[in-house]
Amino acid sequence: MELMVKGADALTVSETTFGREFNEALVHQVVVAYAAGARQGTRAQKTRSEVSGGGAKPWRQKGTGRARAGTIRSPIWRTGGVTFAAKPQDHSQKVNKKMYRGAMKSILSELVRQERLIVVDNFSVEAPKTKELVAKLKELELTDALIVTSEVDENLFLAARNLYKVDARDVAGIDPVSLIAFDKVVMTAEAVKQVEEMLA
């Protein structure tokens, strides 16, 4: 299949990478796994045995007319422990290579189908100026976009850093979450070739 390239000849790409059916279940699973992996998992609460104090019985067992109590750190008491206290845990989920590649191909194919993938011959700015990048995006009529280049472009990355809903990355920096987070994805022709090799 062929992808239209702005300002250059059409680019021939593999149908298995840019023309496959959308596997919603797989994409969902991989995106959820990425979100889970981003969780810190450091939340910690104290159980009744961990809360400081509560060693002495507050009052005697019988004869006071009050409900019996053995410790002031019981979960039903104010300042007591938490019944099912949250503990630090690892939320990460396993995503094997085949699943990851399948999800990436599904997302890229869907971007092509929805005409959200824009391929350009070259995309760069002369200086790390946000103003320059804004002008370039205006030419393409874009306000919400991920720009993917074949290699690290310091000027472009710095220019994009201060823009809302605009991000710039090299091929090594893209993942399923970044591809679906933006309205449009702008890729250089060289980046498309690299993505194809990476997912082959």
From Swiss-Prot:
Task: Answer whether the UniProt record assigns the keyword Signal to this protein.
Answer: no
Q: Which SUPFAM superfamilies match?
A: Ribosomal protein L4
- Keywords, in A-Z order: Ribonucleoprotein, Ribosomal protein, RNA-binding, rRNA-binding
Q: Which residues form the signal peptide?
A: none
GO CC annotation terms, alphabetical: ribonucleoprotein complex; ribosome
Which Pfam families does the UniProt record give? Ribosomal_L4
UniProt keyword Cell membrane, yes or no: no
Domain of life of the organism encoding this protein: Bacteria
Q: Where is this region: Disordered?
A: 42-65
Q: Which NCBIfam families match?
A: rplD_bact
Q: Report the HAMAP family cross-referenced here.
A: Ribosomal_uL4_B
Family statement drawn from the similarity comment of this UniProt entry:
Belongs to the universal ribosomal protein uL4 family.
The subunit field of the Swiss-Prot or TrEMBL record says: Part of the 50S ribosomal subunit.
Instruction: State its role.
Output: One of the primary rRNA binding proteins, this protein initially binds near the 5'-end of the 23S rRNA. It is important during the early stages of 50S assembly. It makes multiple contacts with different domains of the 23S rRNA in the assembled 50S subunit and ribosome. Forms part of the polypeptide exit tunnel.
UniProt name for this protein: Large ribosomal subunit protein uL4
Q: Which organism is it from?
A: Vibrio parahaemolyticus serotype O3:K6 (strain RIMD 2210633)
